A protein has these predicted regions:
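N-terminal secretory signal peptides and thylakoid transit peptides that target proteins
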Residues: 1-21
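Metallo-beta-lactamase
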Residues: 30-32, 123, 128-134, 138-150, 178, 194-202, 206, 213-215, ...
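Conserved beta-strand hairpin/beta-sheet module of binuclear metal-dependent hydrolase folds
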Residues: 38-132, 234-251
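Active-site metal-binding loops of divalent metal-dependent hydrolases
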Residues: 56-57, 110-113, 147, 174-175, ...
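Metal-dependent catalytic neighborhoods of phosphoester/phosphodiester hydrolases
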Residues: 153-160
C-alpha cells in the first residue's frame, strides 16, 4: 500500500480540526486563558561551572526599514519571511548568562530594568533570576558589554538604588566615559546618556575598568569589539578547558546580520566599524568553532556559528534538560 498525504487530505484534516475546536468552545471557556508567559531561565554546564541564562524579555524593534541599512528593504523582508519570521516586526530576545564559578557568581549585562523605552515586554531579569533561585545579593560581579540601556538598565531599581548590593561592576572605560558624559545631554544621544548616568553613576565607586585582552576575572577575558559603541566588548568565558564567547551586541540578529554581515544597524555608533568588527571576530569564532552565547538571538541564545560563501550561519544548540 502506498503511503501518501495529498494536499486535499491535509486541507480536509485542517477543516476537521477547526470544526472540533468550535464544538469544544464551551468546554474551553471554562478554563480562562492566562494571557501571559512566565519568567524563564535555562541551565547548562561549562567545565566546572554552571551557567544559568536568564531572560529580560523581548525587545520589539518594529519594521526593519530604517533599522537594518544597506540592503534593500524588500530583500530584508524576504530574508525574514524565508526564515518564518515576521517581515513587519523584528523582535530581539535579551539573554543574560550568570556563571557560577564556585567562588563567584558573574552576571553578564542587566537588561532594561524598569525602563519601558522599548515597550512592556522587557524588564523581566529580576523575575527570571528569582524563578531560577538566584538572589540579587548572590551576584559578585556584573560584567557589562557596553552602556546601552538594554544592557545596563537593570543596575538600579525603581528607587534608583543599586539592585546588586555585593557586586563589583566591570566595563570598558571608553564606554563609561562616552555614555556618562554630561556634555552629551544636549545632543541626539540624550536618552541613552540619561539612562547610562542613572545606572552607572550610583555604582561609580564599585566600577572596575578592564583592558582589551585582559583576563580581569578568573575565566573571563575581554575582547574589544568597537563599532556598536566605542568601548563595546565581547567576552571569552572559560572553565576547565571549556569556553564560549558572550557576544553582547556584536550581532543583533541571527539571520540578517549573519547572512549579510556588512549590513548596517542604525543603533551602531559607527556602523562601518561595527560591520568590520563583526566580520573579523565572527571569522575567528567560526574558524575556531567557539560556541557562542548571544544576547539578542532567539532564546536561550546559545549555539554555533559557521562561515558560508557570503556570510555566516547560526546553528542553535539543542536545549539539554539533563545537567
Amino acid at each position: 500500500m502506498t503511503q501518501s498525504v495529498s494536499r486535499r487530505s491535509l486541507l480536509a484534516l485542517g477543516a476537521g480540526l477547526g470544526a472540533s475546536t468550535l464544538l469544544g468552545g464551551s468546554a474551553l471557556a471554562k478554563a480562562p486563558k492566562l494571557g501571559t508567559q512566565p519568567a524563564y531561565f535555562y541551565r547548562f554546564n561549562l567545565g566546572n561551572s554552571e551557567v544559568t541564562v536568564v531572560s529580560d524579555g523581548q525587545l520589539p524593534l518594529g519594521p526593519p526599514k530604517g533599522t537594518f541599512i544597506g540592503v534593500p528593504d524588500d530583500e530584508v523582508k524576504k530574508m525574514l519571511s524565508d526564515n518564518f519570521l515576521s517581515p513587519d516586526n523584528v523582535v530581539l530576545e535579551q539573554n543574560s548568562p550568570i556563571v557560577n564559578m564556585g567562588d563567584k557568581m558573574v552576571l553578564f549585562d542587566t537588561g532594561m530594568g524598569t525602563s519601558k523605552a522599548f515597550g512592556p515586554t522587557t524588564g523581566r531579569q529580576q523575575k527570571s533570576m528569582a524563578e531560577a533561585g538566584i538572589k540579587p545579593g548572590d551576584i559578585d560581579a556584573v560584567v557589562l558589554s557596553h552602556a546601552h540601556i538594554d544592557h545596563i538598565g537593570g543596575i538600579v531599581g525603581a528607587d534608583d538604588k543599586p539592585l546588586f548590593p555585593n557586586a563589583q561592576y566591570y566595563i570598558a572605560q571608553s564606554d563609561f566615559d562616552y555614555w556618562t558624559d554630561e556634555g552629551k545631554l544636549g545632543s541626539p544621544l540624550k536618552d541613552f546618556v540619561v539612562h547610562a548616568r542613572k545606572n552607572l553613576l550610583p555604582v561609580r565607586d564599585r566600577l572596575v575598568f578592564f583592558k582589551d585582552g585582559q583576563e580581569f576575572l578568573p575565566g573571563v577575558q575581554a575582547m574589544a569589539a568597537p563599532g556598536h559603541t566605542v568601548g563595546h566588548t565581547i567576552f571569552m568565558v572559560t572553565s576547565d578547558g571549556k569556553s564560549f564567547a558572550f557576544l553582547g551586541d556584536l550581532t543583533h540578529h541571527p539571520i540578517l546580520l549573519l547572512e549579510k554581515p556588512r549590513m548596517q544597524f542604525s543603533y551602531d555608533t559607527d556602523p562601518k566599524q561595527a560591520a568590520d568588527t563583526r566580520v573579523r571576530l565572527l571569522d575567528t569564532i567560526a574558524a575556531n568553532k567557539i560556541p557562542v552565547m548571544s544576547y539578542h538571538f532567539a532564546w536561550p541564545g546559545f549555539g554555533h556559528i559557521a562561515k558560508t560563501s557570503e556570510g555566516f550561519h547560526y546553528y542553535p544548540e539543542a536545549m539539554n534538560l539533563q545537567l
